[in-house]
Every structure is written in structure tokens, then in C-alpha cells.
């Protein structure tokens, strides 16, 4: 039987563990350093100035959660809508941002973060950078590179606000 996990090398598939989807998971946080570094297998990503958001999708239910465990569905209904139609159950991690020109702007996002009427506010985008859980499997044993491979396969970035 073919599964989405077949794109991983066999030794990585063997490390996956079946697990019920948790109600919460602590997001990994970046560590600031003054030292310059470079390693062949390291991944460098652009720093986005927005609101960290974990998305929990199970069936047709989507919960958008801040890193402080605050539900954000009401503030970002277009993100919720873009994730509802996805095929797989998952927990993904990303950043919700607003733009001022070509640059992400936290100050432009702030009114939207506390809005009671998000339809009247600025357009937002969800930049997804990690997948933590997929279809009944905890992915924490996988490298970030392998998780990103699964992320590209599991999440269809066809909705304009999901990137």
C-alpha cells in the first residue's frame, strides 16, 4: 500500500511512531547567536516578522493557535478556510504575516491580531515552514529536511494565503 511516507528513505520511515494527534505541542524556537556559522547540511530561512502560528487539522476541523496557546481562528478566517480543504490531518508550524510593500511588517499585522472584524483589516499570509504531525504519525524523529519533504507533499499550497 502506497502512503505519503513512501517518499522517505526506508530507515527514516522506520523511525516514525503512530500517535493520536495531540491537542498541543510546544513550537521549536530559534536561538539567537552572534557567531557566524556554516555547515553543509544546515538550512537557512528568511526571518519573517509576524505572529507564530501552529495549525492543527483533523478531518474538517482546523485550529489556529498562537505560541501562547491562544486560538486565532477568528482573527484569520481566510487561513482557516485555506487549510480546511487540505487532504491530510496534520500539525504545521508557520508565521502569519502582513506586508508593507515587499517587507513583512509586524506593526501592519498588529491591528489584525486583535481585530473583532478581520474582514475590515489588512490581508495576511501564512508562511508554513515545518510539519510536526501527519496522518497519525509523530514526525519529531525526522530531520528538518525530511519533514520539509513531507510538508511539500502533504500541504497543497493552492490557496492564495497559504505559502
Annotate each PLM feature:
Residues 1-163:
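Catalytic cores of nucleic-acid ligases and guanylyltransferases
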